[in-house]
Amino acid sequence: MNPHSAATTFKPRFPLMKKFSLYLMIALYVLAGANHFYNTHFYEAIMPAYIGYHQLLIYVSGVCEIILGLLLIPNYTRKIAAVLISIMLIVFLWLHIQMLIDFWKNNDKHLWIAIVRIPVQFVLIWWAYSFARIPVSKGIK
């Protein structure tokens, strides 16, 4: 393998921006996860009726978000955390689609939030995955 290949010479184009982006993502998932414990009623309202154990699933997803957010901190766990966050967001996408359908059927005044949330979810998936593509040995300086 060429020692000067892209995999061995990775350098973020904007290292300060990438670092800020990482810290922002860590804060986002830790705070969002904590919010699952403080505002459970918000999450219960958007959970599909056909899924049971709403309270338990809200707490479990909150714990997952906190743990995955914290796993973004060490360089050696960042890649797997980013991949798992991407997968988690893909799983959550179907909940947001169901919320959109329910809001549409019920002519909910918050339909616009459900509409905006879908493309935002794709941005969040891309954002998380962008940290999965950084070679672990290089990290973010």
What are these regions (language model features)?
Residues N2-K141:
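Membrane-interface extramembranous regions
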